Structure formats: structure tokens, C-alpha cells
Amino acid sequence: ATRGVCYRTLQHQDSQVNKLEISPDKQILAAAGNPTIKIFEVNASNPSPILTHEGHQGNVTAIGFERDGRWMYSGSDDGTVKLWDARQGSRHTREYESRAAVTTVALHPNGAELLSGDANGNIRVWDLTMNACSCELVPEVGVAVRSVSVASDGSLVVAGNSTGTCYVWRLQKDAKTTAHFEPLHKLRAHPDEYVLKCLISPDVRSLATTSSDKTVKLWNLDGLGLERTLKGHSRWVWDCVFSVDAAYLVTASSDGSARLWDCSSGEAIRVYNGHHKAVVCCALNDSAVDAATG
């Protein structure tokens, strides 16, 4: 990523790529498409997927791994959240019905709860032990939730929606579940535009928001003051990912490029070109300083 040189291209010929995620052990790359999830080996020369997860009936809009990489989760336009064995290409092991197209899914650091957002404006907490929805929030009725992020220490949840607003809640301290949400802020991050991604930094000091207004904004989580506006993309900015030390941010845009930003200066230090269409997702492998884009 630091050199800005493409050293490998993986073909995903069945559909567009909606989301990318690298496993915690940095060995596999998961690509969410329509309607499957394909698994590639990161450090092998094999250009073909080694596994394909089938079961969704629509676009897969969200994917992720639990911290040990044993299982995966996904969300889809088909209105379901599913769990998968990450190492076997079998059908899903568990399914939750959301009653609306699922747009985003995040795993609580306790590993026992998933938070999903949908096109009808609902946020649901799925208790994996109880195997049921334990809590439901509706920040704005009928306004699609585009992105949900949970702090690495479990202290905060942020949700961004289609009116450009981010909602911030504090989670009950020392709670084993996230059933208690304390509203903290209603942030007009990108007024009259879409918040396409909101992401809490690994050190829980900053919030990144990407938008249809072509910008990325960095906010201080202590008071939610605006720290930086990152400008350079010429079309919608769909996705972002922090480096593990929160010093850098990678972004993906419809302008066909991805960018690497220095968060302290707000400068783009690398621009990655090569895609012939919109770049809508990105993932970062900090152990090798590699970025994946799709």
C-alpha cells in the first residue's frame, strides 16, 4: 500500500464486489458479491476462490469475521443476517430475519452480539447466545441506516444514515449485553447527503465518515468536533478503513480510485488507480501493509 503498486489482481466474474474483509490471521480475503461470498487465499498465487458461501438470495452488503476467524457473518438485500463456518463452503449455520434489506452489520467486541442496520431505518441487536433479537432502535423512521460501527472497547455505537446524520450512543458500562443504549449525539456529518460509511478508529479517538458529497471527514469522538475534511475524490466515497494504529485511512470511491491518507495532516499520500469502474470497498492488511480494493 505504501508503494502504490498493484502486484496482484483477483477476478470476481460473477458479479460486482460489494464488500471486502481480511481474516484476523491475514490468510484469507472474503469478497461479498451477488449473491455469494467468495474466499481467496491472500498469500497464494491461486487467482481462483478456494471456497464459495451460497445461501443469500440477493446482494451481500456486509461481511466480517469473528476475532478468531472461525466463523463469518453477512447481511444481504434479501433481508437476512447469516453466520457461516469460515473454513468450509457449506451453507450458513444460522440465519436471522430482518424484515427489510440489510445494509450493514457489525460485530460487538464481546463476540456474542451482532448489530444490523436496514433500509427501513431499523438497528437490531442479535444475541447469538439467545439466538434472537434482544434490542431494536429506530433513529429516524423510514430513513435507511447505511453504516454501523462499534468501538473496539465496546463503549460506543455510531450509525450513519441517508440524511447525512450520524447517531452516537454510549453502551452501558460493564454490561454483558448491549441492550442499554444511552443517546449521546446527533451529528449532522454530511447535511442533505448520504453517509455511506461511518467507522470508529481502533484507538476509539476518532470517527471517520464517508459520503456522497465526495468528502471524508474525521471527527474527534470527545465532543465530536470536526478535525479534518479529506478532499480529493471526485465522486462518492463508499468505504474506508483505518490502519491498526489509526494513523492512516484508506478510502474507496466511484471515481475509480482508492487513496491512502495521513490522518494527522489530512493529506493523501498515495492514490491507487487501475480500476476501470467505481471502487466501492476496501480492506487493509496491516501485517504486510497491503490494501485490497474492489
Sequence positions of predicted segments:
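Core solenoid repeat modules with strong leucine/isoleucine-rich periodicity
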Residues: S98-A101, L107-P109, L114, A119, ...
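Residue-level detector of Asp-centered blade-edge/turn motifs that repeat once per structural unit
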Residues: P24-D25, R67-D68, P109-N110, S152-D153, ...
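WD40/WD-repeat beta-propeller blade N-cap
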Residues: Q11-V17, E54-V60, Y96-V102, V138-V145, ...
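A structural motif specific to WD40 beta-propellers
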Residues: V5-R8, S48-L51, R91-R94, S134-C135, ...
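Conserved strand-to-loop turn within each blade of WD40 beta-propeller repeats
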Residues: A32-N34, G75-D78, G117-N120, G160-T163, ...
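WD40-repeat beta-propellers
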Residues: A1, I37-V42, V81-D85, I123-W126, ...
